[in-house]
């Protein structure tokens, strides 16, 4: 992600959108392009880490692999209640992002054009899957798209 940009900043924590908003500076004298890659809505959804189930090394998607292998594994797949809790936690993360986005919009000069989207959706038990890619699943393909100019 750090190629072809005039500047690249990597935050110390992958879920620090508020820190990005604090650091961002708008120069009204010339057009600028910012790409902000947010981690708050990604597993393990650690906005509030209290009692959140966690499987080490999970990235992408998996499907009850321990059940399918017929072998005991140290890490178990999430049960239905844990899956619901993870989904609720992700929703809380999105609500938090929405609040911080208000701060970014307030900080931006008039006539700033915003495009808000995502690179993937997320499965929370649909079809037995948890996570995203490398699968083609309806939930993984669902992404928001909002755009507009601050007036």
Language-model features: where?
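Catalytic domains that recognize anionic headgroups
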Residues: 1-151
